[in-house]
């Protein structure tokens, strides 16, 4: 029968880390034990998993999923993340689609670069993936006197209860993946 190895597809020649094996095993276990996720998880797999340290000794697990399967993952995102967080107790789980950045074409080259492969587009898409149950309702970029930039991202206040405890994890993961500082806030709504 199948094993946990079928739940992770790495690039050729890349060894599986211990965390990759644990995540693949968790997906395999969920597919076999959880009836409501069984049919959806049957055809899904992951590319890799990375552990990110958050302040206060907490950790987050970033699971990279194939770009083609991102819509299928979005349908079951909330339930899947809840189950994975139970399996990896005390760690936040964040699902991100694997995307590639292509360098700008050389001068005189006829080849065009697709918009979704630019650095800006990939970083914005990663930001959307990181905060997924919530939606981004606004962004502000603040330039400090010393030249550093901080991006303020405003999240949908309706999802405050589901995502407020993960805001630190969102910032740490986005900083690790892109190198950019970001602060997440919920705008104040007038009643």
Swiss-Prot record:
It comes from the Eukaryota. Keywords: Acetylation, Coiled coil, Ribonucleoprotein, Ribosomal protein. InterPro entries: Ribosomal_eS7 (IPR000554), Ribosomal_eS7_CS (IPR047861). The keyword Acetylation applies. One of its GO terms (molecular function) is structural constituent of ribosome. One of its GO terms (biological process) is translation. The keyword Coiled coil applies. One of its GO terms (cellular component) is cytosolic ribosome. The modification N-acetylmethionine is found at residue 1. Residues 15-50 form a coiled coil. It holds the Pfam family Ribosomal_S7e. Belongs to the eukaryotic ribosomal protein eS7 family. This is Small ribosomal subunit protein eS7z. It comes from Arabidopsis thaliana (Mouse-ear cress).
């Amino acid at each position: 029968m199948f094993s946990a190895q079928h739940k992770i597809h790495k690039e050729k020649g890349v060894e599986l880390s211990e965390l990759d094996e644990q995540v693949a095993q968790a997906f395999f276990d969920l597919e076999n034990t959880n009836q409501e996720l069984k049919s959806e998880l049957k055809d899904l797999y992951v590319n890799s998993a990375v552990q990110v340290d958050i302040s206060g000794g907490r950790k987050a697990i970033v699971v990279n999923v194939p770009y083609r399967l991102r819509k299928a993952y979005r349908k079951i995102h909330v339930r899947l993340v809840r189950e994975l967080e139970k399996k990896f107790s005390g760690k936040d789980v964040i699902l991100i689609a694997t995307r590639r950045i292509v360098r700008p074409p050389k001068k005189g080259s006829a080849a065009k670069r697709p918009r979704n492969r630019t650095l800006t587009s990939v970083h914005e898409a990663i930001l959307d993936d990181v905060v997924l149950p919530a939606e981004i309702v606004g962004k502000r970029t603040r330039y400090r006197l010393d030249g550093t930039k901080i991006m303020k991202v405003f999240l949908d206040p309706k999802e405050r209860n589901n995502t407020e405890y993960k805001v630190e994890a969102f910032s740490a993961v986005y900083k690790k993946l892109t190198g950019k500082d970001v602060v997440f806030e919920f705008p104040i709504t007038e009643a």
